[in-house]
Amino acid sequence: MLHPDGSSRPPTREQAQAILEQLAGPQATLRDDQWTAIEALVVHRRRALVVQRTGWGKSAVYFIAAKLLRAEGHGPTVIVSPLLALMRNQVAAAERAGVHAATINSSNVTDWADIHDRVRNGDLDVLLVSPERLNNPDFRDQVLPSLAHDAGLVVVDEAHCVSDWGHDFRPDYRRIRTLIGELGANVPVLATTATANDRVVDDVATQLGVGGGETLVLRGGLDRESLRLSVVRAGNPAQRAAWLAAHIDSLPGSGIVYTLTVAQAHDVAALLRERGHPVAAYTGSTETAEREQLEADLLANRVKALIATSALGMGFDKPDLGFVVHLGAPSSPIAYYQQVGRAGRSTASAEVVLLPGNEDQDVWRYFSSVAFPSELMVRNVIHALELDRPQSTPALEPLVDLGRTRLEMVLKVLDVDGAVRRVKGGWIGTGEPWEYDEARYRKLDEARKREQQAMLDYQDTDGCRMAFLRSQLDDPDLLDGERCGRCDNCTGSRYDGVVDAAAAEDTRARLMRPGVEITPRKQWPSGLAKLGVNLSGRIGDGPSPGRVIGRVTDLGWGARLRRVLEEPDGEVSDDVVQAAVKVLASWDWTTRPTAVLALDSDKHPKLIGSLARELARLGKLTDLGTLQYAPERRPVAAANSAYRVAALHGSWLPPDPAVIGSAGGPVLLVDDVTDTGWTLTMAARVVRAAGAPDVLPFALAATS
């Protein structure tokens, strides 16, 4: 930093303190451990990994370092940040310190060109980018080289995402290693996280040191002195939801209620609103503008709680958040520590309550089932790519049997490994050799199972709950036998898990209210011609909107429907028939069905057939029997839409037009479970081709 006498002197702690006061107010005081990190970056130009508890002030460290480096004439700071909520909070924090900051992410596409110009012109002090942007062809080729050359500091926020040993690994984060390797050895790099055990710390530190010196690791204690941890065994889903409805008003301030699935978030939010509680659902499917409004509502205490999935997590900063409740346990105690860390940052006390359920492990198993694919599937992706002709992800789907999400994950991993490359227009192969690290993936799977068992152990422990979580994170400051003195096990003060019987029954009735609309498919997947199916464009002969009793992930009907689908095939039970009748009675169809047709099934022919017969009898509808499979049909194990449609094409014997015509109106088409919607779509085409004027699909359950 230049002084009046023309000399250049290293920045001082006093200068750092002044910037901190701009960030956090005149009452803020820079701590020794924060200055150690800042000094390592600004004075010694080190690469550092800071592992500190939520609320320690990691963002203050990199904003202070960014401003000090900028004052010395260095280039802008590049912050890689994973979530939009995190970016919004960080831009606001930078502005408070007089730092010119901008962000490039999926929600501000129209601003990208202007921001690129500001980067090239040197008008920005800080640029926040999502990890996905690092391999966007335009950004990678036009903006990233100058950033790598001119950057004064590179920051990797939520750095545990870099490591596939971490609880929230993101393939895009692996590109950061490439970015760091292209930096000059004297460009400081800072990685920050609150959730990294020894294995993750070692992995991240190694990746951080690529092309530079040894990584300085600064780890602090992870105790959260304000949090009072509790576990409440309240029973089944309805009883747990009733417990929440009865206790939410007594919880301090405003907070977050986490659920494991999107369906649960919406169910619980609707239930609580009906009980008069000001809450709203917040999930990964919530539109960006609505997310921002919901975050603002919570920050301003206009809502008692957001009922959220993990989409509301890293980076959301409300210092006075009074409580975090989990309606269902996450699969990792490390992920749990991170989510509960949202609470009590600036308050003397905050309540953290876990309401675990027996069905939690079903959700864990589902998410485990969509992990990294087999070697054969990955090699199919490599072989499908050409060296000189880019192919988009939708164009690749008909060539490989992977769903969109898993295909994108595979492409990102292969890109980092050098086997494929993203270019304008899609993806190309590189011809470089690639090895499938089966041993590593097996070890990762084993590590995930250990985390799941640890989460079960957390629920059952009679020891200190905070000490348990800190031990999972290998907290260097945790002493043998240390107790927090605040949790339910340390104090003996526990919430009563007993729920008023009438309230529980009322909640059960609300959650068990059957009926969920299923939207028909409107567009054929691209590339079907490559699979020998001559279908494209809009679907003109599919079904109308349909209904299911519920989703298998619902808090209400979910558990019952899972049991029905898992049990040996047999006649439909009375409670399921009654639920189906309620759904049909509340269905606001334009034209009532006049007939019922069951879909053939390998798993549940008796279940579906008996349900269709009962609906025909009770509704006085014509029973058309079963739409039979064709003998030559192909098995439908496909993961993506194109393969699934191709497999379903020609799967049923065409019904007799005279039989279909005898119905004299729309046909109710009955199935057991709908996942992608393609089975009902393809079957409806067959029925309509035989003369049905309309097809109304009905299934017991939807998977999502």
Task: Please give the residue ranges for each predicted region.
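Helicase motor core with emphasis on the C-terminal RecA-like subdomain
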Residues: P10-R13, A18-Q22, A28, D32-S59, ...
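A short, structured active-site edge motif that brings together acidic residues
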Residues: S106, G220-L222, G284, L597, ...
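Active-site-facing substrate-recognition patch
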Residues: L227, R508-A595, H604-P605, G609, ...
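C-terminal accessory region of SF2 helicases/translocases
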Residues: V303, V325, A329-Q338, G344-P545
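Arginine/glycine-rich "motif VI" loop of SF2 helicases in the C-terminal RecA-like domain
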Residues: R342-S349, W589, G619, R688-A692
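PRPP-dependent phosphoribosyltransferase catalytic core
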Residues: T491, T507-P514, T681-S704
